[in-house]
From Swiss-Prot:
The gene is nadK. Gene3D superfamilies: Probable inorganic polyphosphate/atp-NAD kinase, domain 1, Probable inorganic polyphosphate/atp-NAD kinase, domain 2. It comes from Syntrophotalea carbinolica (strain DSM 2380 / NBRC 103641 / GraBd1). The active site is at 68 (proton acceptor). Belongs to the NAD kinase family. Disulfide bonds: none annotated. Involved in the regulation of the intracellular balance of NAD and NADP, and is a key enzyme in the biosynthesis of NADP. Catalyzes specifically the phosphorylation on 2'-hydroxyl of the adenosine moiety of NAD to yield NADP. It is found in: Cytoplasm. NAD(+) binds at residues 68-69, 142-143, 153, 170, 172, 183-188, 242. This is NAD kinase.
Length: 285
């Protein structure tokens, strides 16, 4: 690996400081470093300043300095290129950014020697159809959420799995999550935690009107089709809680497994269930 891209949470002073140190460390080893323009400005180094979206196509490795939100944003930029991502946690929870600040340079040494393993994380593709035409398309690492606005009423959503009608959810919203996203909004809404190696997705209603409506796990080969049965309501679709669009009556949302995945470099010192236990504060035996 000779060409390294760095993304950081630029409004986080620690992230900018760590980025500056990492740039010096990498260049001291003869490696070429690529920075997004805002980060290059913040660290005072315009030598390799590039548009955010162009970096994944130019590098062999991406380092993300921040939290899970920063990494999720970068994952959409990578868009299926076979570029591994090393996530360094400078935030709070950090399910995806497994590497701690103290482990950063030891982990980098191992990665540059090729001594690392990858966790391939399934992604989703969500398409919004309006009057038979594509109105929006989103790549998703964590979840697709359909949610009501501040003063909207309960939403009616007719849901099918492939061609089979499932039910019409009457709820505050609906979450379609990957195994990676099962520890995000899905978990808060009472959905199950799913090991990232499993090939499935979970459909979780948000505050359903019917107590019998419960989260449903389906195969990752399924297409989830959601038809909006709205009555002049304020309803939005969000992808990973970061981008999205307003939905209208009659809109159809189709969600399926994407052709691409996100490749995360695993921590050399932690297993998934150790991370889970630590982050959720589960007790020891």
């Amino acid at each position: 690996m000779k060409r390294i891209g760095i993304y950081a949470k630029c409004n986080h002073p620690d992230a900018v400081m760590v980025a500056r140190d990492v740039v010096g460390w990498l260049r001291g080893r003869g490696l070429e470093v690529f920075l997004e323009k805002k980060l290059a400005q913040d660290v005072g180094d315009a030598e390799q300043s590039h548009d955010r979206g162009s970096i994944p196509g130019m590098v062999d490795l991406i380092i993300v300095l921040g939290g899970d939100g920063t990494l999720i944003s970068v994952a959409r930029q990578v868009c299926g290129r076979d570029v591994p991502i090393l996530g360094v946690n400078l935030g709070s929870l950090g399910f995806l950014t497994e590497i701690t600040r103290g482990e950063l340079y030891l982990s980098l040494e191992k990665v540059l020697k090729g001594e690392f393993s990858l966790s391939d994380r399934m992604m989703l593709e969500a398409v919004v159809w309006r009057h038979g035409l594509e109105a929006g398309r989103f790549s998703v690492l964590n979840d697709v959420v359909i949610n009501k606005g501040a003063i909207a009423r309960i939403i009616d959503m007719e849901v099918s799995v492939d061609t089979a009608y499932l039910t019409t959810f009457k709820s505050d919203g609906l979450i379609i999550a990957t195994p990676t996203g099962s520890t995000a909004y899905n978990l808060s809404a009472g959905g199950p935690i799913i090991s990232p190696g499993l090939h499935c997705l979970v459909v979780t209603p948000i505050c359903p009107h019917m107590l019998a409506n419960r989260p449903l796990i389906v195969s990752d080969t399924a297409c989830i089709r959601i038809e909006m049965k709205l009555r002049d309501q304020d309803v939005v679709l969000t992808a990973d809680g970061q981008v999205g669009m307003a939905l209208e009556a009659g809109d159809v949302v189709e969600i399926r497994k994407a052709d691409r995945c996100t490749r995360l470099i695993k921590s050399p010192s932690k297993e998934y269930f150790e991370v889970l236990r630590t982050k959720l504060g589960w007790g020891e035996r």
